[in-house]
Amino acid sequence: MSDTEITFSSGDVTLHGSVRVPVSMRGAVPGVLLLAGSGPTDRNGDSALLPGSIGTLRHLADVLERRGFASLRYDKLGSGVTGLGPYEVEDVADLGFSTFIDAASAALDFLGSRRGVNADRLYVVGHSEGALIALTLAQDNPRIRGIGLLEPLAVRLLDLLTAQIDAQLDAVVIAQKLPVQIADELRLALTGAVESLRADGTLSDNLPEPLRNAGLVPANAKALAEEDALDPRMLAAQIDGDLPVLSSASTKDIQIRIEDVDALDDALVHTRLTKLRMTHTNHVLKDIGTQQSTGADYVADLPFSEEFTTGFEAWLKSL
């Protein structure tokens, strides 16, 4: 079935997206809102930062259609046809992470209003950062009947960023490509940046270049501080106990840590939790076999992971 192009509004922004509603002889079908990961990632899961097709969310829509679920995926602000909407580049600093949460909530409303979609059976499936938004939407929200957390952001954002930068610094020091003293100076500057964001939501404009390249610039400060304030484990602990939840993680994912997702699962133990653990799947849910993920494999012409797809379909069947 082909996608139907749609638009919906959130605040001053008109968001562009795609809806699929399978034809069913049994009446209205359940609907799933698909939420993309971080950065300029569009409705299909493709990123403006990576040349080539990734297609993660498009694949999820295909699987959902096979299982009789409607889906909505959209170009979030800063991506795809939506672009920056009514904003100029200089306006970005005034936009917080709540902008993306509000858009997801509006998308859920829109999906529930579509003809052929059962508004009493709405689900949210988020990939990476999208999982954090799914957890946020699920707080005291009886409209949502289940959530999928796929390769999720499982710790506070700045904790993850710190761990990632620490690992990168360790690697270049071991390879003798960076003096220990400079690495220590970068770590000290990073600690100060995190403390500033958590204290008053600001960032210095003279941080070292490697930290600025990692996104630690004043224009991103508000969004970073707002997102970091959302602790995935605290949100998970507050979810209704009867909610079906899928949590997926792979040992080949270089953007998350299995132990972090395990800790998130501990906070979800009171829910109807399904854990999906994988060994051949990269962050964008492609099968990389026994090779190591480098990030270049995200846009490689690889099949989507059968170990993921089989587990995802089994979870959908249980709903």
Predicted regions, residues:
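Alpha/beta-hydrolase active-site loop
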Residues: 92-114
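Short beta-strand/loop motif that positions the catalytic acidic residue
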Residues: 247-249
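Short, surface-exposed "cap/lid" segments of acyl-processing enzymes
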Residues: 24-28, 32-63
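Primarily recognizes the serine-hydrolase "nucleophile elbow" in alpha/beta-hydrolase
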Residues: 106, 110-116, 120-169
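N-terminal cap/lid segment of alpha/beta-hydrolase-fold proteins
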Residues: 1-27
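Catalytic active-site module of serine/aspartate enzymes centered on a nucleophile-bearing elbow/loop
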Residues: 284, 290-319
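Accessory cap/linker subdomain of secreted extracellular hydrolases
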Residues: 148-238
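Conserved alpha/beta-hydrolase "acid-adjacent" motif
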Residues: 254-260
